[in-house]
């Protein structure tokens, strides 16, 4: 009965001992500079911007204000991949046949006894308990084999947080301006605008996962862009577009078997969960929004504010 219980327990330990997914958690970004990362980040940003509903801005002249969360960092996964060689170890030994012959010395003892005219003679043969000669002979060949599994563990993730990358921010700002232009919406300086459009980029970075099981392994890289936008009429301070959220995720995945491969590589993009907290449920205390719209920092994006040089230049031109 105990053996029946022990077998499934050992089997479960064997199956589950090396299974799991390690996720590096960088601060905002993950270091996104090689080609696949660039492709994923650009795809998620394009999808999020392209999905913006701008119908209410048709025929209007808008001023854009874009704020981006710091997004640049670096990270690396070390260790973790396992190879066939000590989670479970067994050995098979094939030894040759060995025969040893011993030669022991023998000696003879004779004893004569006389008593009352009777004489007795006793002869005995003894063997000395120490071989005088030994001979060992082997027959056949010998072999030894072993099989095991070497587990490298789940690995270690290391990351470094840097300041906002101005090129990433400028690229995202240009994507927004391109979509507005293609939609037939004029983007002008704040002095000539009748509508203010505010876009907050909350998530703009990468996620890397590693899945390790005994037979199946996978490396996954994801890029996410999550933004919230709204538009305000400068004349009456009413919201033309209430706060809306767009969130998209692009993924690149490599599938392995015993870390051999990859036998399959896939890429894709899809909508993902929105922001943990958004402003869609905020209502003004009065009948309209505040008299002053959120201001734009006059420092450029190189100082860590997330506005592109073009937006800052337009804002400065509109100042008296």
Curated annotation (Swiss-Prot):
Residues 1-18 form the signal peptide. Its main location: membrane. A lipid is attached at residue 19 (S-diacylglycerol cysteine). GO terms for cellular component: cell outer membrane. A lipid is attached at residue 19 (N-palmitoyl cysteine). Residues 288-320 are annotated as: Disordered. It is found in: Cell outer membrane. Disulfide bonds: none annotated. Residues 288-298 have a biased composition (Polar residues). Keywords: Cell adhesion, Cell outer membrane, Lipoprotein, Membrane, Palmitate, Signal, Virulence. It is a lipid-anchor. Coiled coil: none annotated. GO terms for biological process: cell adhesion. Belongs to the MafA family. This is Adhesin MafA 3. It comes from Neisseria meningitidis serogroup C / serotype 2a (strain ATCC 700532 / DSM 15464 / FAM18). The gene is mafA3.
């Amino acid at each position: 009965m105990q053996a029946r219980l022990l077998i499934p327990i050992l089997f479960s330990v064997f199956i589950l001992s090396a299974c799991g997914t390690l996720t590096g958690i960088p601060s905002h970004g993950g270091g996104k500079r090689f080609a696949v990362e660039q492709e994923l980040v650009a795809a998620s940003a394009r999808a999020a911007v392209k999905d913006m509903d701008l119908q209410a801005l048709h025929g209007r002249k808008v001023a854009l204000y874009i704020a981006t969360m710091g997004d640049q960092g670096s990270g690396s996964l070390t260790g973790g991949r396992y190879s066939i060689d000590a989670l479970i170890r067994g050995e098979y030994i094939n030894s040759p046949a060995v025969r040893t012959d011993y030669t022991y010395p023998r000696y003879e003892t004779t004893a004569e006894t006389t008593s009352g005219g009777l004489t007795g003679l006793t002869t005995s043969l003894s063997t000395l308990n120490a071989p005088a000669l030994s001979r060992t002979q082997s027959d056949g060949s010998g072999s030894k084999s072993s099989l095991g599994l070497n587990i490298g563990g789940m690995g270690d993730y290391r990351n470094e947080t840097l300041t906002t990358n101005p090129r990433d921010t400028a690229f995202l700002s240009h994507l927004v301006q391109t979509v507005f232009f293609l939609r037939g919406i004029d983007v002008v300086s704040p002095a000539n605008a009748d509508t203010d459009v505010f876009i907050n980029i909350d998530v703009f970075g990468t996620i890397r996962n590693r899945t390790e099981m005994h037979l199946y392994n996978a490396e996954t890289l994801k890029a996410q862009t999550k933004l919230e936008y709204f538009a305000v009429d400068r004349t009456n301070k009413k919201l033309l577009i209430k706060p809306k959220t767009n969130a998209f995720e692009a993924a690149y995945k490599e599938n392995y078997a015993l870390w051999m491969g990859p036998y399959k590589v896939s890429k894709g993009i899809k909508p993902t969960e929105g922001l943990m907290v958004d402003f869609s449920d905020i209502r003004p205390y009065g009948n309209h929004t505040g008299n002053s719209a959120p201001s734009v920092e006059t420092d450029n994006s190189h100082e860590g504010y997330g506005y592109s040089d073009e937006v800052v230049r337009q804002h400065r031109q509109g100042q008296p």
